[in-house]
């Protein structure tokens, strides 16, 4: 039985889809000049990440969450092509490409982010990170949740070797 086709209930006008994404990167050496960028925000007192791109794990996790909804692989496909053919390392451009992969009848309605890392200190910049995410996704600030934990030394991230991010993203799809 096809539940959607055979249901006596009317077809809903909106379908909610949930995407999940993850990314992590190891820090470069302390002497690296590459900036540490998270959610498009620069953290001055930490080295950048080992990555072809700027290493923005927050924007990368969001890209992966969108990819889990659209089935279009951005990181490892589109982003690699942008890097190798045009030298583009800006993760906000990768995120723009992920957003473009949404159908015209799909809207991002909410995003939740959690970050784990012993460094940098996230709390002073959480507000700026929320604003940057809201702006990049063209959603209200109230639709962006973000938490961070130090990891208490329990993993490589908690020991300060890198940073990890998970993202849960809700997409509303109009079916009327």
UniProtKB/Swiss-Prot annotation:
- Annotated site (Transition state stabilizer), which positions? 52, 150
The EC number of this protein is 4.6.1.12
- Which top EC class is named for this enzyme in its record? lyase
Which pathway does UniProt place it in?
Isoprenoid biosynthesis; isopentenyl diphosphate biosynthesis via DXP pathway; isopentenyl diphosphate from 1-deoxy-D-xylulose 5-phosphate: step 4/6
Q: Which InterPro entries match?
A: MECDP_synthase, MECDP_synthase_CS, MECDP_synthase_sf
Q: What is this protein called?
A: 2-C-methyl-D-erythritol 2,4-cyclodiphosphate synthase
Q: What does this protein's UniProt record list under function?
A: Involved in the biosynthesis of isopentenyl diphosphate (IPP) and dimethylallyl diphosphate (DMAPP), two major building blocks of isoprenoid compounds. Catalyzes the conversion of 4-diphosphocytidyl-2-C-methyl-D-erythritol 2-phosphate (CDP-ME2P) to 2-C-methyl-D-erythritol 2,4-cyclodiphosphate (ME-CPP) with a corresponding release of cytidine 5-monophosphate (CMP).
The protein's organism comes out as: Chlamydia felis (strain Fe/C-56) (Chlamydophila felis)
Subunit (UniProt) = Homotrimer.
Q: How is the cofactor bound?
A: Binds 1 divalent metal cation per subunit.
Biological processes annotated in GO:
isopentenyl diphosphate biosynthetic process, methylerythritol 4-phosphate pathway; terpenoid biosynthetic process
Q: Which UniProt keywords apply?
A: Isoprene biosynthesis, Lyase, Metal-binding
Reactions catalysed according to its record = 4-CDP-2-C-methyl-D-erythritol 2-phosphate = 2-C-methyl-D-erythritol 2,4-cyclic diphosphate + CMP
**Pfam families found in the cross-reference section:** YgbB
**Highest taxon above the source species:** Bacteria
Q: Per the record's keyword annotation, is Metal-binding included, yes or no? A: yes
**What's a Gene Ontology MF term here?**
2-C-methyl-D-erythritol 2,4-cyclodiphosphate synthase activity
In which residues is a divalent metal cation bound? 23, 25, 60
């Amino acid at each position: 039985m096809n539940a959607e086709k055979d249901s006596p209930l009317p077809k809903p006008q909106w379908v909610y889809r949930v995407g999940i994404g993850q990314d992590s990167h190891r820090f470069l050496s302390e002497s690296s000049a590459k900036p540490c960028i998270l959610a498009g925000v620069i953290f001055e007192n930490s080295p950048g990440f080992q990555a072809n791109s700027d290493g923005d794990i927050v924007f990368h996790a969001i890209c992966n969450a969108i990819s889990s909804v659209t089935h279009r692989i951005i990181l490892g496909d589109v982003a690699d092509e942008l890097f190798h053919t045009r030298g583009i390392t800006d993760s906000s451009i990768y995120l723009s490409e992920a957003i473009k992969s949404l159908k015209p009848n799909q809207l991002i309605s909410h995003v939740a982010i959690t970050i784990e890392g012993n460094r940098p200190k996230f709390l002073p910049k959480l507000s700026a990170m929320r604003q940057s995410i809201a702006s990049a996704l063209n959603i209200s600030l109230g639709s962006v949740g973000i938490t961070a934990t130090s990891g208490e030394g329990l993993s490589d991230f908690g020991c300060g070797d890198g940073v990890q991010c998970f993202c849960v993203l809700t997409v509303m799809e109009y079916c009327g």
